Regions:
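Mid-to-C-terminal alpha-helical segments outside catalytic/metal-binding sites
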Residues: 4-10, 23-44, 55-95, 99-100, ...
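Bacterial N-terminal signal peptides
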Residues: 11-21
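Active-site gating/metal-coordination segments in enzymes
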Residues: 28, 34, 99-100, 107-210, ...
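Active-site neighborhood of phospho(di)ester-bond hydrolases with catalytic His/Asp-centered motifs
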Residues: 43-46, 104, 134-136, 166, ...
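Histidine-centered divalent metal-coordination motifs
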Residues: 44-53, 198, 235
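Conserved, mostly hydrophobic/aromatic
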Residues: 47, 93, 120, 165, ...
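Active-site environment of divalent metal-dependent phosphoester hydrolases
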Residues: 51-54, 108-111, 140-142, 173, ...
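Catalytic pocket-lining loop regions of alpha/beta-barrel enzymes
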Residues: 160-164, 177-294
Length: 343
């Protein structure tokens, strides 16, 4: 009986999720931002994903489908597909009262799949005031087509709504200390496009777990060689595989040594990471690095995630005695200053 009720509950939840994804966008006069102690914070979520079900790898589809009962997994193509379009992303941002967000292209054919630069451009073109693009580059045949990939990357970054670059070394099977990819960092510096670098482990299939792929200390020589490039250490070294702050010390050390190093806390506001979030925020504050952290969620993932991630993050900041000014810096102005945006 319990299993039967559980299936009914899960089925209801799945149906609710499908309805949630397909709710209409909120009115154009929607009020965005948070009000903390009477002051407004115009939150920016720099870490959002787009894509399609068909472009995901089969192992990743299986992992993603674990969220719903087996007899409803046929719905995942439609559920996920609508959620990762620009319309789906904007709905989740609206629910969280987030006006602006960064959206990533992804080239991880061995782990999660592909959301190409061209697809990303299609999704964000009609929303330049709200969706900011982070281009990526395919690296799996780098020894053969590296120069062509760099040329394409530079061309894509010529679009005004492409504000940065995203790399995921553990997903793309790239060591942090591999000098073959210096061309990517050179382009980032020359074009003044900050580069987001995934650090820490991932629970997704076939991602690398060895330190040279996940510990940002292996990136230090690259940072030294490219002082004009702004590096954002994604996930702040969060060890999602072990649910621990395993590589945060490396991130802290790099941010303290180099003015061109920032951190992003994507996924640390997820339910899974609740036990380490407060510790993370305490460490950031104790090391006087609030001005080096740029908020991101790693959303939208599933209906309500973008909002719940932000809610947990804000609650944890308040519990950690962050001032309103510190919260505004982390949630809004650090991004605006680094990316030279006008509010």
């Amino acid at each position: 009986m319990g299993k039967f009720l559980s299936k009914i509950q899960l089925s209801t939840l799945t149906c609710f999720a499908m309805i949630f994804w397909n709710e209409p966008l909120l009115a154009e006069d929607q009020d965005y931002g948070l009000t903390i102690q009477g002051e407004s914070i115009d939150v920016i979520d720099m870490h959002l994903h787009t894509g399609t079900w068909d472009a995901l790898t089969e192992p990743y589809k299986e992992r993603y489908s674990e969220r719903v009962p087996k007899f409803l997994r046929f719905t995942m193509k439609y559920l996920l597909g609508s959620g990762l379009t620009s319309e789906g992303i904007l709905k989740q941002m609206d629910k969280a009262k987030i006006r602006r967000g960064g959206v990533f292209a992804v080239y991880s054919p061995d782990t999660t799949g592909i959301a190409s630069n061209q697809f990303l451009q299609q999704q964000i073109n009609d929303h330049p005031e709200r969706l900011l693009g982070f281009a990526s580059v395919r690296t799996d045949y780098w020894n053969i087509d590296g120069p062509e990939q760099l040329k394409e990357l530079e061309s894509v970054l010529g679009n005004s709504n492409m504000v940065g670059i995203k790399l995921a070394h553990a997903h793309q099977q790239m060591r942090f200390d591999d000098p073959r990819f210096d061309g990517v960092y050179e382009i980032a510096g020359r074009l003044e496009k900050p580069i987001y670098v995934h650090t820490g482990t991932s629970p997704n299939p076939y991602t690398r777990l060895e330190p040279p792929y996940v510990d940002p200390k292996y990136l230090e020589d690259t940072i030294q060689r490219h002082p004009d490039t702004q590096f954002i250490l994604g996930h702040s070294g969060y060890d999602s595989f072990k649910v621990a702050l395993t590589y945060l010390d490396s991130c802290i050390e790099l941010a303290q040594k180099y003015e061109n190093v920032y951190m992003e806390p994507g996924a640390l506001g997820a339910r899974k990471a609740e036990k380490v979030l407060t510790e993370y925020l305490r460490i950031i504050k104790e090391n006087n690095l609030v001005d080096r952290v740029i908020y991101g969620s790693d959303g939208p993932q599933f209906p309500g995630y973008t909002n719940s991630h932000l809610e947990r993050f804000v609650e944890a900041m308040q519990a950690s005695d962050y001032s309103t000014a510190e919260m505004r810096a982390l949630l809004q102005t650090n991004f605006e200053q680094l990316f030279k945006l006008q509010n």
